[in-house]
């Protein structure tokens, strides 16, 4: 069971790097205040990473890029670069919002370890956000249900359905893992498809699948920062010791068609 402590040498290195990134300087309030109003957002769930800085009024800076295996060094460098470009000091950061999955095992653990390292070193507020919520928050309300996708490899995607309520996307049912073909076969009514839509999956989708344009498919840390700041302001924050990643359950192949049908209900 994950109790929030690093379990591997790699994770300990990640946290050590994070602590070097932001030295301990202040102890912020769990609610945004004028002494530490900046939120840092980190998403490393897949090979598309993103970081952002947001204050109480605006998104100060954002950077997204395709990552390789050197997640930790690249993320730390991007965070420093954004802070320097905005003249933001470590003492001004009061919270860290982090994408907790699903996604690749290494990627999800990387972002979470960095966020925990920073939060532990400086007693920062930490907010964990599902990758699906980041994707959904970027979509326009077209009065269509949403299918948010996160690629997890081997021609499979993690899928979460959303419905619109009071102008906001709301989770509808449990998230699942589906093979591309099973997902495509399950779509029998118009639905907005967004997130990681690989070319191979795109070729299988029929006319009922309305695929979001490329800019809306990118998981951007700016949207993660927006969700995180809203939760911070309302006191809906997480415990750095117990916050854990979301890992994909392994569905049996024979179950996938049934699960796809359930998603469309």
List each model region and its residues.
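DPxDG-like acidic metal-binding loop motif
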Residues: 97-126
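Stable alpha-helical structural segments in soluble proteins, enriched in small hydrophobic residues
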Residues: 82-86, 121, 139, 224-232
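Acyltransferase
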Residues: 169, 212-265
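Phosphate-handling active-site elements
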Residues: 84-92, 119-129, 144
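Surface "functional belts" at beta-alpha junctions
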Residues: 34, 58, 70, 125-219, ...
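Intrinsic disorder/low-complexity segments
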Residues: 1-36
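N-terminal beta-alpha supersecondary unit
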Residues: 20-22, 30-100, 218
């Amino acid at each position: 069971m994950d109790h929030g402590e690093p379990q591997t040498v790699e994770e300990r290195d990640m946290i050590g790097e994070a602590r070097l990134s932001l030295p301990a300087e202040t102890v912020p309030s769990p609610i945004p205040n004028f002494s530490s109003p900046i939120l840092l957002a980190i998403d490393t769930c897949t090979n598309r990473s993103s970081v952002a800085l947001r204050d109480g009024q605006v998104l100060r800076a954002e950077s997204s890029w395709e990552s390789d295996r050197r997640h930790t060094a690249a993320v730390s460098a991007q965070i420093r670069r954004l802070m320097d470009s905005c003249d933001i000091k470590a003492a001004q950061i009061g919270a860290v919002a982090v994408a907790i999955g699903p996604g690749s095992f290494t990627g999800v653990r990387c972002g979470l370890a960095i966020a925990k390292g920073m939060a532990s070193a400086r007693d920062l507020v930490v907010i964990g956000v599902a990758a699906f919520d980041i994707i959904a928050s970027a979509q326009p309300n077209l009065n269509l249900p949403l299918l948010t996708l996160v690629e997890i490899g081997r021609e499979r995607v993690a899928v979460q359905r959303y419905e619109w309520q009071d102008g906001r996307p709301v989770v509808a049912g449990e998230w699942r893992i589906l093979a591309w073909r099973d997902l495509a076969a399950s779509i029998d009514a118009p639905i907005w498809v967004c997130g990681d839509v690989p070319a191979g999956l795109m070729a299988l989708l029929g006319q009922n699948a309305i695929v979001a344009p490329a800019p809306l498919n990118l998981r951007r840390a700016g949207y993660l920062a927006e969700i995180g700041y809203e939760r911070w302001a309302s006191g809906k924050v997480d415990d750095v010791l117990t916050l854990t990643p979301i890992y994909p359950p392994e569905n049996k192949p024979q179950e996938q068609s049934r699960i796809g049908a359930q998603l469309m209900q």
